[in-house]
Amino acid sequence: MAGSTYGLDKIAGVQGYLVVNPDGAVLASSGDLENDEKTAGVIVDMLQTASMIPLSGDSSHSLKRLSVHFGNFVLMATVTNQRIFIVKRPTTETE
């Protein structure tokens, strides 16, 4: 997919990434997650569901990051500036 990599290709050990808008549309992608609209949709749904859970009594606190751990990799999603950045990395011994 053409466009900026948003610097995600510089993350150590990255196996793939997605940049998604809040509606789930893929804006940029690479590697194992190249054009993976299904994963994008699932992560957006998970973020929307998780954001409904109050984290504290202070309404200014909101969900900013979500990690989904699998056997040999982790998907990490960060929400910022109306974009969702999803990165796939291998798990390590400490995770």
Curated annotation (Swiss-Prot):
Keywords: Lysosome. It is found in: Lysosome. The keyword Lipid biosynthesis does not apply. Regulator of the TOR pathway, a signaling cascade that promotes cell growth in response to growth factors, energy levels, and amino acids. As part of the Ragulator complex, may activate the TOR signaling cascade in response to amino acids. Belongs to the LAMTOR4 family. GO terms for cellular component: lysosome; Ragulator complex. The keyword 4Fe-4S does not apply. It comes from the Eukaryota. Its main location: other. One of its GO terms (biological process) is protein localization to lysosome. The lineage of its organism: Eukaryota, Metazoa, Cnidaria, Anthozoa, Hexacorallia. Part of the Ragulator complex. This is Ragulator complex protein LAMTOR4 homolog. InterPro entries: LAMTOR4.
